[in-house]
Regions:
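Non-globular, low-confidence helical/coil segments that flank catalytic cores
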Residues: 4-203
Length: 203
């Protein structure tokens, strides 16, 4: 999840879970987008660290509960910024046609973009930058798991944004939609636990 103490993104899929990250001297609390009631993981983390030590709360937007959770946490704890995925990409992107890679081992080169799927992980090379997008362990066979997005090299040249958690197109297992941007372009990825993925380059 971290390389040399630098985290790009880590997002909990499990309901009620949360992850703490530090990146470029900022502290981020990333929640699952559920209902952040008193005593939930996000609130416990805030109480433990102290609100003055947290710079951002980031919550994927997947339900009305998520939106109400953002407002309550922000108002109660006076965090400097609480954002959802659509805050980052509300104007949207225009993408080319979908390209699919199935199975646990595949590789494709598309101009300066090189994608390798191996053991349910996706390695994305954009020139000097290399990023990994993957799921962590699924707890007890449930849908709860950890999506890990990290810059392996050239981390300062790339940006990874969680778009949504989705269960619609890959059976009962969750999939994740992620936008990755570097100096060579922008790509939207959809990744599942079983190694299937699609990507769309920005038009």
């Amino acid at each position: 999840m971290c390389i040399r103490d630098r985290c790009i993104a880590a997002v909990s899929v499990g309901d009620g879970s949360a992850v703490v990250m530090k990146y470029k001297y900022k502290t981020y609390v990333v929640g699952c987008g559920g209902n952040y009631f008193s005593g939930s993981a996000v609130c416990d983390i805030i109480n433990t660290l102290g609100s003055s030590n947290i710079d951002y709360i980031i919550l994927p937007e997947d339900s009305e509960k998520s939106l109400s959770g953002v407002r309550r946490v922000k108002e109660t704890y006076r965090i400097s910024s609480a954002v959802t995925a659509t805050d980052r990409i509300k104007d949207g992107f225009s993408f080319d046609s979908v390209v699919s890679l199935n199975g646990n081992s595949a590789e494709i080169t598309d101009g300066k973009l090189k994608i390798t799927v191996q053991d349910s992980r996706v390695y994305v090379s954009f020139g000097d930058s290399l990023s990994e997008i993957s799921f962590g362990d699924v707890n007890d066979g449930s849908d709860a798991g950890l999506l890990i997005c990290r810059g392996l090299t050239g981390y300062e040249k790339s940006d990874i944004i969680l778009v949504s958690t989705d269960k619609t197109d890959i059976g009962d297992l969750p999939s994740q939609k992620v936008i990755l941007t570097s100096q060579n372009g922008t790509v939207l990825f959809t990744l599942s636990h079983n190694g299937k993925m699609t990507y769309r380059r920005m038009a």
